[in-house]
Amino acid sequence: MRLDWCRHLALGALSMICFTPSLAASDLQKDTSLGLAPQDADLYMASYRCREQWEQFLQSKAVREIHQLDYVQKIVAKFKAQWESADGQLAQAKTVLKTPLAQDLIKLATEMASEEMFLFSDGKASQFLVGVNALNEELVEATGDGPEAILEWFESLTREDLNQVPIPTFVLGFKFQDEDRALNLLDQLQAVVSLGLNSNPATVQFAEAFQRVEDARGTRLVLNLHASMLPWDVWEAGSDSKELIQHWEQLLEGRKAAITFGILDKYLILAMSEDAKQLTKLGKQGGSLAQHADLKPVMADPSKPLTGVAYVSDRFAEAEYAAQYQNYFSKIYRQLAPSLALITEEGEIPEFLEALESDLEWLDDEVDQLMPDFKGSLSFSYSTKTGSEGWLFDRTESQWFDGSKRLDILDHVGSNPIMVSAMRRQPGTDWLTLARKVMRKAKGYLEAYLNSDELEEEDAEELAIVMKKGWPLLNRFADVIEQKMAPATRDGQSALVIAAGSLESKQWVKDMPPASSPLPLPEMAMVTGLSDKDLYVQGCAEIYSILDGVVDLVRELNPEAIPEGYSIPRPERKTSGGSEVFLYPIPEDCPVPKDMAPQVMVDARWAIASYSAKQSAELMKMSSSMNAKLQYKDRNLAGASYVDLGAFFKFAKPWLRYAIEMDKGDINTPLSDASDEIPAPTGKDVLDFIQALGSLGKVWATTELDGTGTKTHWRFEE
């Protein structure tokens, strides 16, 4: 099953790096690399106005507080003093940095890091991935048949096979201002590289392929590489496989690539392509990525200050899925087949595993039928007065999220959580059905293994007991999930909630030395939406019964492992405010707060698993505070999340103080030995740093269904 939520978090984090005042969207094609990237680009990532991003980061509250710390000020002062009185190697470095060449390099690097930076590929990147994956699958299959099969595979390759692996164009670029400075540095780079290549007979041919290109779009240095430049004669002389080397020399004849560095319009680029001439077509022929229909959300509001864009094409997303996950299980089998053959003395796959390859191919087909057609994504971000915001459009049909209804579980995440991750999932019955099919096939293999000659007598006896008594328990558990827990939670809503709460103690474990001040513990709960409370309670009770069976099975296999008569303890059952509570009371001699007890609180609509009675009671009540924070105005949501980043550091500080006091006795004691370069930090210095991180901001995100895909909107505020 596709992990949509993880992908949203990853791409959302990528777009969050860009959150400063930037360009109007109407100027994107003219003023940014979106006008340079081809319309068929497979990948595009860009960050705009980088200097302002850095300046805004430095002006954030947490960074300002860190900069003002005594220890940081000491380090800064120490560095300045060392720099001013530099001697030895540091003095030499200081002298080098003052040379005109070094100054020009520093100024150019500053320009490159101040404006715009980007990376994109053309449409051949997906073709390259598809071609490499196809060849890799053939190679893996040949690997399973031994070294001779691998050699035969290499010998069987044709030019048509290699033509399926084109060389894509990748361009890494930076916007700059001073063209004269850049040209001067290109001149010096050309001179140094040419001198180095011509000074060695082995690299003279590379010197001849190293060229300077000047046209209306700029000046660039190009290294043209050809397959003929490879040392075929040397390889033939030192190899026993001359025919294979000659075969590959013929296969690669005419293949070429170019590495380009220099100026293209207002950008300094480093590019790899099949032909350097392809770069001159960028932004001029075939349209630009800014004109692509997938980029319409970026262009929709020209008044917002755009700060970053990340784009993946449908072709590349499909190729990436095929390369990583298509035929996943049969690929693993082919890789492991040689090892499986070592199980028997004859060096062949054991008889009970002969059908494994075909069954794994069946499993691949079943999974493939359940998976959606993978498509690409688009994320982009803007700056705001209080931080930043952005969107992620994932065009792949979601088989996990259900956004058809209001996400009313957000009314039951408390009044002031420090973290919430809520969603509504689809039933997923097709996956449960497939899991049962896999279980039946797995049982067949275990039974065949039991009846084979591969097991020692004692091991066979234990496996026979497991199959006789353990497998029915597994079947019962699957029945409970499919027939009780899944229908009982068909509502599909769930939420992980972490709150500050009131749980604190100077001593959390009896053997733990008491702390000088209370140590807080965040309250954590899992809230689950119920469609049938009675069925849910019955399912939980059945799971306890199954666990008792597991205890009996373990005791039979190893009588000394579990005492006779022991069974899984059942929770106490109470009522509280119209809800039923199933809990395990904390023992009287345990030093933790007495209102702390592992429990599940259940009413007709919700099940709340927690270890805090106060949190369970609060979450069972309705609260609209999260709705106000998310600002989603009762829209139908598939998911929502909220994190107070600084709050986690505030919780960590007392525990870190306790650890330092236990180790050093006093927070003012240095934590390490001082050196001439860096003063040793004390425990207080570390605690002050953690205190500053407590000023980090908050992140909100909501996910909605958008056609067949999903749309996630996130906000970051200090």
Give the role of each language-model region.
Residues 10-20:
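Bacterial N-terminal signal peptides
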Residues 1-10:
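Bacterial N-terminal signal peptides that target proteins for export
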Residues 41-45, 170-174, 219-221, 269-272, ...:
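One face of beta-strands
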Residues 140-151, 159-168, 172, 252-282, ...:
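Charged, amphipathic alpha-helical scaffolding segments
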Residues 249-339, 407, 591-681:
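A conserved glycine-rich beta-strand in the N-terminal activation segment of trypsin-fold
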Residues 25-229, 312, 316-348, 354-357, ...:
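Structural boundary/hinge residues at secondary-structure and domain interfaces
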Residues 563-564, 571, 577-595, 645, ...:
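Interaction-prone hydrophobic/basic patches in short secondary-structure elements
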Residues 177-259, 296-309, 519, 537-599, ...:
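Short Gly/Thr-rich strand-loop-strand
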